[in-house]
From Swiss-Prot:
Ca(2+) 1 binds at D252, D258, D305, D307. Binds Ca(2+) via the C2 domains in absence of phospholipids. This is Multiple C2 and transmembrane domain-containing protein. PANTHER family: C2 DOMAIN-CONTAINING PROTEIN, MULTIPLE C2 AND TRANSMEMBRANE DOMAIN-CONTAINING PROTEIN. It holds the Pfam family PRT_C. Its cofactor is Ca(2+). CDD domains: C2A_MCTP_PRT, C2B_MCTP_PRT, C2C_MCTP_PRT. It comes from Drosophila melanogaster.
Length: 912
């Protein structure tokens, strides 16, 4: 593009500005008035200026009235008009009459009126300059000539692409000028400004400088490229991270505000943030994703102050121009808030947000609106899952956390987790140990788990975990260091519940490899039993489906999913919607660390807001598993006592366990792995009574054994006492320390023989059925009992527990008081007895002492039939008082009446 064409465009813009009323142009009347010389004629300079303006004809106002001498194309000089020649003659002679001045003025205004009418006719024609064409915006989805057509191929822009049209010439000239500007940078500006005819040859200077016009052309060209790039996509997703606000305006009487933010597009609400109470520098820290169909439509951001029961106060607003964003790149934006009239100011504050605009295809658009449409397919997967996996997080503990300003521990420490749009806040703890478990849903777009350490309202540190690097269907123990502060957090993380068919956990895509099965069996052979002692075995669980589940929803259906737990490892299936007979068809694998562990299988119903309802539970010890057998298991209730609700609910499983016996034996002699998440026990009347009865049964068994031995001493059955007497003598004469385990082994052998003879192979299962019947009977009896009877039963059990605890406490205190001279006489007696025991045990073997003690017990009935059977040690301790008795034996010091009056101020006032 030549420079003369550029200056012609500038003159055209200047002429349009001159034709507007109120502008500072010579045509509108801002030209300084004609000054008459002392001789009664205009000055020479004013005459030349007036002649230059009058020499322009109406046709010359179309664009070419200023010429650059350096231009290669010089326009021919125009002939001066008659008025101009007369003015020139007047200026040369210096004499003019008053009539000549009036004629010249009259001709000037006629010419001005002619040019004004020509300008108005051009405005009606609607001809636009290149700058107007660049500033014109088009509707986003208006042109769809073809799928591969660009913006200039659309019918709306044919006027700029036809080679012979004036608009096409202007469009090409503007594009060429932009290329020159981009190539030479600021050198072009200097050349135009340095031209001798700029501002000195009669051309009035434009309102905008050349630098500003060049920047405007560059900005328009960049905007045009971005718009062309945006038009290549039909759908977008905008990720908005609302971080914080600063220096917001105070709307309440206390000098604070309760701000929240609304995001709107075309009057439609996209998102509403939570309210931060009493804060002018709020930290929302919220992330959400919204669909964008028209990126040329700005997003309106409004901030309000929440008022309970009243209308919320407006605090400021701002606009988001999505065309300024780079696709796929996260950008931090500071939004300066302005009032409703559009006047901004530092007093209204600003909002800090992070934006990422992702382009999406037509298929993604259809899939998005199909998921969100209420009239989508109404099959059994009506509530189709849009998440890909479930992330189960167990917050265990933290260490080396920062200290408070005074050097003490933080007393209100908690963690906040965020995965996409979902968030979780843990409980506050000052012990740095939480043991909380929760689930978050994993989406394909965002797989970064954000962790933040808070103490009250203060943020101390953050950490980000990339979930894409972790193996699915496996539990991982993680120690994650925190950023911006010292400390680490311990997590147990599991990614399960995958819905894709191509995952390894899907039975339809699973093909059993005989070579892998053989390698798995060889890993736990006897020859390799000492290689890795912690790897006890391998468990494979195939979950096919369930039937007869209870209806948890209003429509008589449920949304069941299955959770499998082995120790602290936790996996789960996907959710099957609107069914009572789900088919999960999943396969899971567990690393067995202890063969004595149990596999817990629980079926839940999924509700909104991550809430679940219990449908059934099953517990299977690993030692009872029959490998490779596909069978149905009955689901039980929460207490694992009776059948769960529903139509005989069952679950179909196939379990396979491979383990090493030597490793299992070594592991059984080590501490058992503690399960981190356990259900918190609450006080229940029935549970309390049941536990007391269990303890009572054990105590009664011990008492029965003691009575059996005492009956042998009392010769209630001569045959039984004779056998016991002979057995005691033989054991004392020939017995040794190995006799103790031999006796225990004989007890086990006796129980095994009883089980073998009676043929009972599964006593636990038989007990479950009886327990179910007893439990049903207990429920019926409980319903018939009155409140008085229930309270009386609780009172009796509580009294028994109270007396037992009191007896044990008294016995322990008496033993302690024996050694601390609470009763000196009894303590010295204990000293004498202990000295005698030392001498006897030193000179007499233990077996002879036991033999003598047995003879005394067996002969008491024969030699001393009237004596009362007793225990000498308990008889001695019963003579020693406990702490309560010592307090009761203590004497009070005698006191005078004056002391009593002084100690009782009420009596003193009454007497006075």
């Amino acid at each position: 593009m030549s420079r003369i064409q550029y200056v012609d465009q500038v003159d055209q813009v200047e002429l349009d500005q001159q034709q507007q009323p109120g502008s500072s142009s010579t045509v509108s009347g801002s030209t300084p008035p004609l000054q008459i010389s002392p001789h009664g004629s205009p000055s020479l300079q004013q005459s030349q200026r007036l002649g230059k303006h009058l020499s322009k004809s109406a046709s010359e106002l179309n664009g070419h009235d200023c010429h650059l001498s350096e231009s290669p194309h010089i326009s021919p000089k125009r002939a001066k008009s008659a008025v101009a020649q007369q003015l020139a003659g007047v200026s040369s002679g210096g004499v003019a009459s008053g009539v000549g001045v009036l004629q010249k003025t009259h001709g000037f205004f006629n010419n001005l009126r002619h040019r004004w009418s020509r300008a108005k006719s051009k405005d009606r024609l609607g001809r636009k300059s290149p700058s107007d064409f660049l500033e014109e915006s088009t509707d986003y989805a208006a042109d769809y000539s073809s799928e591969g057509s660009s913006v200039t191929h659309s019918p709306r822009h044919r006027s700029t692409t036809i080679g012979g049209s004036p608009l096409a010439r202007e469009f090409r000239a503007t594009a060429k000028m932009a290329q020159v500007i981009q190539r030479f940078g600021g050198s072009m500006e200097g050349r135009i400004d340095e031209h001798p005819e700029n501002g000195s040859a009669g051309c009035s200077p434009p309102e905008l400088s050349t630098q500003q016009q060049l920047e405007a052309l560059q900005a328009n060209e960049l905007r045009r490229k971005r718009e062309a790039q945006l038009r290549q996509f039909v759908f977008f997703q905008l990720r908005v991270h609302l971080k914080s606000g600063s220096d917001l305006v105070a709307m309440d009487k206390n000098g604070l505000s309760d701000p929240y933010v609304k995001f709107k597009v075309g009057g439609r609400l996209l998102h509403k943030s939570r309210t931060i109470h009493r804060d002018l520098n709020p930290v929302w820290d919220e992330v959400f994703i919204v669909p964008i169909e028209d990126p040329f439509q700005p997003i309106i951001v409004k901030v309000f102050d929440y008022d309970w029961g009243l209308q919320d106060d407006f605090m400021g607003s701002a606009k988001l121009d999505l065309t300024q964003l780079e696709l796929g790149k996260a950008e931090d934006i500071h939004l300066q808030l302005c009032d409703s009239s559009g006047n901004g100011g530092s007093g209204l504050g600003e909002i800090l947000i992070n934006l990422t605009l992702w382009p999406r295809s037509q298929e993604d658009k259809e899939m998005h609106f199909q998921r969100n449409s209420k009239l989508a397919e109404s099959s059994k997967r009506l509530k189709s899952q849009i998440w890909s996996s479930v992330v189960t997080i167990l917050l265990v503990k933290a260490k080396d956390l920062p200290l408070a300003e005074d050097g003490s521990k933080l007393n209100d420490t908690h963690f906040k987790f965020r995965l996409g749009n979902e968030k979780y806040k843990s409980k506050s703890s000052w012990t740095e140990r939480w043991l909380e478990q929760f689930d978050l849903h994993l989406f394909d777009e965002d797989q970064n788990l954000e962790i933040a350490l808070w103490n009250r309202n203060t943020l101390y540190g953050k950490a980000i975990i990339d979930l894409s690097v972790f193996q699915r269907e496996n539990t991982h123990g993680i120690w994650k260091p925190l950023e911006d502060c010292p400390g680490e957090v311990h997590l147990m993380l599991t990614i399960s519940g995958t819905t894709a068919l191509e995952t390894i956990s899907d039975l339809k895509a699973f093909k059993e490899d005989p070579r892998e099965a053989q390698l798995l069996r060889e890993r736990y052979k006897f020859l390799r039993c000492l290689q890795n002692l912690r790897d006890v075995g391998h468990l494979t669980v195939k979950v096919f489906g369930a039937t007869g589940l209870a209806a948890a929803d209003i429509g008589g259906k449920s949304d069941p999913f299955c959770v499998l737990e082995l120790g602290n490892a936790r996996l789960q299936t996907q959710t099957e919607y609107k069914t009572l007979t789900p088919n999960w068809n999943k396969i899971f694998t567990f690393n067995v660390k202890d063969i004595t562990q149990v596999l817990e299988i629980t079926v839940f119903d999924e509700d909104r807001d991550h809430r679940v309802e219990f449908l059934g539970k099953l517990v299977i010890p690993l030692l009872r598993i029959k490998s490779g057998v596909k069978r149905w298991y009955t689901l039980k209730d929460k207490n694992l006592c009776v059948r769960a609700k529903g139509n005989s609910p069952q679950i179909q499983l196939e379990l396979t366990v491979v383990w090493s016996e030597i490793r299992a034996v070594c592991r059984a002699l080590q501490p058992k792995e503690e399960k981190l998440i356990q259900q918190e026990a609450k006080f229940k009347r029935q549970l309390f009574l049941r536990n007391v009865n269990r303890l009572k049964e054990i105590i009664m068994d011990i008492l029965d054994a003691a009575r059996y031995v005492q009956s042998c001493f009392e010769w209630e059955s001569p045959v039984r006492s004779s056998i016991a007497f002979v057995f005691w003598i033989v054991a004392c004469v020939y017995g040794d320390l190995e006799t103790v385990p031999l006796v225990l082994l004989l007890i086990i052998l006796k129980n095994w023989l009883v089980r073998l003879i009676t043929g009972t192979t599964d006593a636990a299962a038989h007990y479950d059925y009886e327990y179910d019947e007893d439990d049903d009977d207990d429920k019926e009896k409980e319903e018939k009992k009155s409140i008085k009877e229930r309270l009386q039963a609780i009172q009796e059990v509580s009294q028994t527990v109270q007396n037992t605890i009191g007896y044990l406490a008294s016995l322990g205190e008496s033993t302690i008081n024996t050694f601390n001279f609470s009763v000196p006489e009894l303590t010295w007696l204990a000293v004498v007895l202990l000295l005698g025991a030392i001498l006897v045990l030193h000179f007499v073997p233990l077996r002879w002492l036991l033999l003598f003690w047995g003879l005394m017990k067996f002969s008491r009935r024969l030699l001393r039939p009237n004596t009362i059977p007793n225990n000498e040690l308990l008889d001695f301790l019963s003579r020693v008082p406990d702490n309560e008795e010592i307090n009761q034996y203590r004497e009070l010091p005698p006191s005078a009446p004056t002391d009593q009056t002084r100690n009782n101020p009420k009596k003193k006032l009454k007497g006075s």
